[in-house]
Amino acid sequence: MKNPLRSSFSTEGRRMAGARALWRANGMKEEQFGKPIIAIVNSFTQFVPGHTHLHEIGQLVKAEIEKQGCFAAEFNTIAIDDGIAMGHDGMLYSLPSRDIIADSVEYMVNAHKADAMVCISNCDKITPGMLMASMRLNIPTVFVSGGPMEAGELDGRHLDLIDAMIESADTSVSDERIEQVERHACPGCGCCSGMFTANSMNCLNEAIGLALPGNGTIVATHKNRIQLFRDAAKQIVENAYKYYRDGDDSVLPRNIATRQAFLNAMSLDIAMGGSTNTVLHLLAVAQEAGADFHMEDIDMLSRKTPCLCKVAPNTHTYHVQDVNRAGGILGIMNELMKAGLVDGSTRRADGLTLAEAVDKYAVTSPNVTEEAIRKYKSAPAHRFSIQMGSQESYYKELDTDRAEGCIRDVEHAYSKDGGLAVLRGNIALDGCVVKTAGVDESIWKFSGPAKVFDSQDAACEGILGGKVVSGDVVVITYEGPKGGPGMQEMLYPTSYIKSRHLGKECALITDGRFSGGTSGLSIGHISPEAASGGAIGLVRDGDIIEINIPERSINVRLSDEELAERRKAEEARGKKAFTPPTRQREVSKALRAYGKMVSSADKGGVRIVED
């Protein structure tokens, strides 16, 4: 049975003459009435290199959709550049922007009763925000991202944004060298070239099934990226007709993003050592989808999924462009599926099951298509460009070496332990997250005295001022979703630790979060957070923190009685209990509202709205 068009509320009937007049004023042709209206949800902005090349793409998608008879209308969301917002109070706005993006998409699409949508995303909070909206709306949706930036090159080696941050804080590096790194680290459009948050989410979108093959890995500058947008436009029209004309609800986001799809996506994330932010985002998207997917599932998967792909910042050898050459996300999914670690029966927006997509697109599959080979041979041009599709370079051959190449099979895994782990203990009763792919195995077991700071700013000053020494555990409190408010990323503190050559000699733990560019023994999302009465807010300078990644534990060496006494003393502060004792920070009304409504990190840091 076919489903009625949502847009019929504004396009049919005598009383809708005014609305139809406005649709005509928007350019709708007579023959387009009665057909699906497709929203193009773009995120173009000139503040973000991951989005600066999207200004013409929305209209390209519109033209492709309208070739097939439907009407398409474009609008934009906000988009924050985490790298530019980093290191000052601008970062307080990053995570809250995810929910604002989700709201804005819901508002626009529901207000105008669009029937389907193409989501053009790319960077950190934009993809998860649009994903959250797609689950709320549950109308046919296809995602296509702006693609990864090419890796920078200097002195014969790859580099990226994180190199610029680390070297700029290293007093042994000359100003001339820093200028050279700065000029070469980010060679144009696309989201930063490592497996940071933006690229991680665009890759996970392939695993969830809402994005087409190559979405996460074909560089932004390549002509094949433009073809991906055309393919997405054709796919959304096909899916809209499947749902509204044919009554096929298998194309709806909630029927694609099932519990098993989230398990598949998290297995991929663990296997490729993706950003810890993906934990927050997948939990948030699953909550909007009504999928039974929780922190306990992530813990379970982390104990059985090996690390099959190691990319910057976890190594200097490979960037996302190298993952593409090795067969992209479906190349990794193929290895996971062969080992029985993902479910091949999950559905996708392109109408295939995961198993069918792997058979068609995995470069080591005997049935791999010429289209797939062409996608994964898409190469960087090694020149500066801020224009999508400005080059057509190809690798001469693919990387199909599963023993020593970029993507490994299970037998030759980088490590039997996966790239992410959930730890628990007396200062993280509800869990915390560490990217094990970025931690040297020599410090998987670590203990040391706490150096406590009640803000990121204070921690940066302490690290650069020499207050942190070898063996210390830096503890940053009151930077969680509620305590920040906004749950800042701690990229500068971790980068400064590296710049002081303490990357393998110190740990950092926080109720805040980390950039996807972070590596080292950096443990975030500690829940409950300090501002919610979490025990991390009871840690004091000199307390011994014990971290054991193999045993998935993190504790402060204090008895239950000692912690209870400290809690009693803290609560005696009255209204000031579990607030930062020394921090001076102005918090806007918008951020205060977010802080009063937000859930803890182990629940995805989403807003709580009472029924």
Curated annotation (Swiss-Prot):
One of its GO terms (molecular function) is 2 iron, 2 sulfur cluster binding. Keywords: 2Fe-2S, Amino-acid biosynthesis, Branched-chain amino acid biosynthesis, Iron, Iron-sulfur, Lyase, Magnesium, Metal-binding. Its cofactor is [2Fe-2S] cluster; Mg(2+). It is an enzyme of class 4 (lyase). Pathway: Amino-acid biosynthesis; L-isoleucine biosynthesis; L-isoleucine from 2-oxobutanoate: step 3/4; Amino-acid biosynthesis; L-valine biosynthesis; L-valine from pyruvate: step 3/4. The keyword tRNA-binding does not apply. The modification N6-carboxylysine is found at residue 125. Coiled coil: none annotated. It holds the Pfam family ILVD_EDD_N. Residues 565-586 are annotated as: Disordered. Residues 565-574 have a biased composition (Basic and acidic residues). GO terms for cellular component: cytosol. [2Fe-2S] cluster binds at residues 123, 192. Disulfide bonds: none annotated. GO terms for biological process: isoleucine biosynthetic process; L-valine biosynthetic process. Homodimer. Functions in the biosynthesis of branched-chain amino acids. Catalyzes the dehydration of (2R,3R)-2,3-dihydroxy-3-methylpentanoate (2,3-dihydroxy-3-methylvalerate) into 2-oxo-3-methylpentanoate (2-oxo-3-methylvalerate) and of (2R)-2,3-dihydroxy-3-methylbutanoate (2,3-dihydroxyisovalerate) into 2-oxo-3-methylbutanoate (2-oxoisovalerate), the penultimate precursor to L-isoleucine and L-valine, respectively. NCBIfam families: ilvD (TIGR00110), PRK12448.1 (NF009103). Belongs to the IlvD/Edd family. This is Dihydroxy-acid dehydratase. The lineage of its organism: Bacteria, Pseudomonadati, Bacteroidota, Bacteroidia, Bacteroidales. The gene is ilvD.
